[in-house]
């Protein structure tokens, strides 16, 4: 997954990563909002969910210490991150 993740964030198209956990209440609320955002942005950007329990190494590599955490990448650069 790590190589696929790196390919994903190296895209010219912006990528919003939603670092979440299945047990996280606020993550569930945020998920419905992100579905609406995804419908509105269409092909302008990608929105991808990463379960921190399934991929803890990726979460750790990008300094995710709590969920939900959102991060925006473009061309491999982290443009914004918020928990």
Task: Give residue ranges: language-model regions.
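A short beta-strand-turn-helix
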Residues: 1-14
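Short pre-active-site segment immediately N-terminal to redox-active cysteine/selenocysteine motifs
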Residues: 12-13, 20-23, 66
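Hydrophobic beta-strand anchors of alpha/beta hydrolase catalytic cores
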Residues: 16-17, 47, 70
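ABC family nucleotide-binding domain
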Residues: 18, 31, 35, 61-62
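The canonical Cys-X-X-Cys-His
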Residues: 24-27, 70
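Typically the conserved alpha-helix immediately C-terminal to a functionally engaged Cys/Sec
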Residues: 28-42
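Structural microenvironment flanking redox-active thiols in thiol-disulfide oxidoreductases
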Residues: 52-59
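Non-catalytic, surface beta->alpha helical segment in thiol-disulfide oxidoreductase systems
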Residues: 66-83
